[in-house]
């Protein structure tokens, strides 16, 4: 587990509010220092996380690091179709979480 004293956690936030300050302003989200500036997104289950992961990488051309949380040890879960860079980022994330 990764424990830091300078982490700000907020939610639940809709995806647009988590990622875009303009959406937070339009929706009049108040009192959130994370809205529009999220560095990390958590999903309620592996299925919804996978949908976001696939959409981001395939339609957005992004590289993402993915890891399953809640296990005794870091668990990297990559897809056969993931790029080498996404696999490397996922391994690096798991190594950081293992410390």
Where are these regions (language model features)?
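Short, small-residue-biased leader/transition segments that mark boundaries at the very start
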Residues: 1-2
């Amino acid at each position: 587990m990764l424990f830091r004293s300078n982490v700000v956690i907020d939610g639940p936030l809709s995806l647009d509010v988590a990622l875009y300050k303009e959406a937070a302003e339009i929706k009049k989200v108040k009192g959130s220092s994370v809205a529009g500036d999220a560095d990390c997104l958590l999903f309620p289950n592996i299925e919804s996380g996978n949908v976001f992961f696939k959409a981001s990488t395939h339609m957005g051309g992004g590289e993402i690091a993915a890891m399953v949380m809640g296990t005794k040890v870091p668990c990297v879960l990559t897809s056969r179709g993931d790029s080498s860079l996404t696999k490397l980022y996922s391994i690096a994330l798991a190594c950081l979480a293992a410390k």
